[in-house]
Amino acid sequence: MSEARRIAVVPAYNESPTVIGVLDQLIGEVDEIIVIDDGSTDDTRSKIRTWIDGQSAPARLIAFERNRGMSAAYDAAFTGLKQQLAAGEYRADDLVVTVDADGQHDVSVLKMLHDEIEIRGFDAVMARRDLSDYPRFKQIGNTVMSQWASWWAGSKFHDVESGYRMMRLGALADAMTYYKGYRYSETVEVAVVLSRLGYKVSNDLVVPVPVMRSNTRLRDAVQDLCMCPVAWYRAVRRRPVRR
C-alpha cells in the first residue's frame, strides 16, 4: 500500500505579513495545501492566489466574501475532503494537518506529529504548545478549558485549544457528523467528539511556539466551554447535526 498523503489545511484572516512564509515552509512537507481566506480585508487573498499560481504542487484556495470565523473555514475544507473521501479520491488513512497562517506553528516539527500517528498508532495528534512565555491569565484559561474538555471527552487533554493537529481523514470525516463548530469552538469540539467516538487522540507532544498570539475574547472562551457538553451529547447520543 502506498504511503498516506498529507493534506495541509490553512485558515487565514488578515495574515498578509506571514501567510506566504507559512505556505513556503509547508512545500515539501505535505502533498497538498488547502488555504481558506476567511474574508480578509487586506491583501491576504491576492497574495495567496499569486503564490498558488506559481506552484507546481497541488494547492487550492477557498475564499469567503465575509469573515465567518475559524470553525466555518475548517468546515468548508473538511466538508470538501469528506466528499472526496466518499468519492474515492482520498483514503481513510490519509492525513489532514491543520496549520495557522500567523506563523505560530513550527512546521519543522511536522515529522514528530507524523511519527505519533504512524509509529505510536494514534488516530489524531494535537500538538501541546509550550505556553511558558504567554501571560499567566492565558495559561490559566488554557488549563481550565483543557480540564473541562477532558471531563467531557473522557480523555486527558493538556492543550485542547491547540490548532496544530494531524488527523486521519477517516476519523475526521466520522467526527464531522457529530460536531457543528461555532466561531472558534471547532478545536475543542473535535477533540471531544473524536475521543467519545473511540478514536485514539494524543495531546502529549510538546512543541515550541515561534510567534506569540493571544487575542481570544471572553465571549469566544465562554462559547467554547458551552460547546464541550454539546459535542459530548451529539457524539454519545449519536444525534447527527443537520448540515
Give the role of each language-model region.
Residues 12-13, 36-38, 64:
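Conserved sequence signature across two-component system core domains
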Residues 34, 46-91:
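Conserved donor nucleotide-binding strand/loop of the catalytic core
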Residues 13-29:
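Short, well-formed alpha-helical segments that are part of the catalytic scaffolds
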Residues 4-7, 26-35, 43, 58-60:
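Short loop->beta transition adjacent to catalytic acidic/histidine clusters or analogous donor-positioning motifs
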